[in-house]
Amino acid sequence: MMPSPQAGDADIALLLEGTFPYVSGGVSSWINQIIRAYPQYRFAIVFLGSKRQDYGTFRYPLPDNVVHFEEHFLYEDVQRGTQLQPMERQGDPQGTALVRDFLAALAAGGPHAPQAMAAFEAVAAQLLPGGAIALEDFLYSRQSWNLLCQIYRDHCADPSFVDFFWTVRIMLQPLWTLARVAQALLPVRAVHCASTGYAGFLGGLLAQTRSIPLVLSEHGIYTKERKIDLFKSEWIHDNRNIFQRDPAELSYFRQLWIAFFEWLGRYCYHRAD
């Protein structure tokens, strides 16, 4: 692997999920072209991947105006999170209240309501290290457990609580990794996301917490691509019996994953300039 440049600041942070410099063609090609077309700007690249083993070596040499490179593998962090020492925690009442406010806003006005986005932003800001919604509380607190049980009873159409529990954990835990990345990222003047998804959430969080411009280039329409992947995926269970299933209806867990990626996209578009 090529040595990674490090810098104290940069002009533009490129937030790249599963693309340049590890994957050739497509998105990576035009990212490479953009960087080389603007030699007057100093770029910082934040690469987001699934697991380190899923990527080989760089397919592109980093241009000279890439002054900083860092990489984060979100599902390796999920595995590390499950290795945290479980211990009794009550949770932060402020953080729990913010999550409940978000759920209430969703129920009252739907996902497109302005109050739902405002409540989501309040939750996102508290995911940062030192915030009221700590990863340890999400994983182990009594308040988190009670809230999870309530959501399962009120909304889950799948009979398996075990699958619901682990789906929610796996789905949401990368957001705390991204919040840590957002807080630790070097100073930049602007942020550019090649897509929505996890990179888009990181971009939205940086724009929100640092008040810097966010540019979004939707290549391939990320959310639709994720929907196609979710329709095809065999690892998402449907535990309903033949009498409970509606052939015309998606399974609950597929709906949950789709709603999650739609929210990441909605947040990024809301914050983009």
Give residue spans per PLM region.
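A conserved catalytic-core segment of Leloir-type glycosyltransferases
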Residues: 7-9, 44-179
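Histidine-centered beta-alpha loop that forms part of the nucleotide-sugar donor binding/catalytic region
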Residues: 17, 48, 218-221
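A short, glycine/small-residue-rich beta-strand->loop->alpha-helix junction that serves as a flexible
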Residues: 18-29
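Short, well-ordered alpha-helical microsegments
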Residues: 31, 199-202
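Membrane-proximal helix-turn-helix segments that form the acceptor-binding/catalytic region
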Residues: 177-187, 222, 240-273
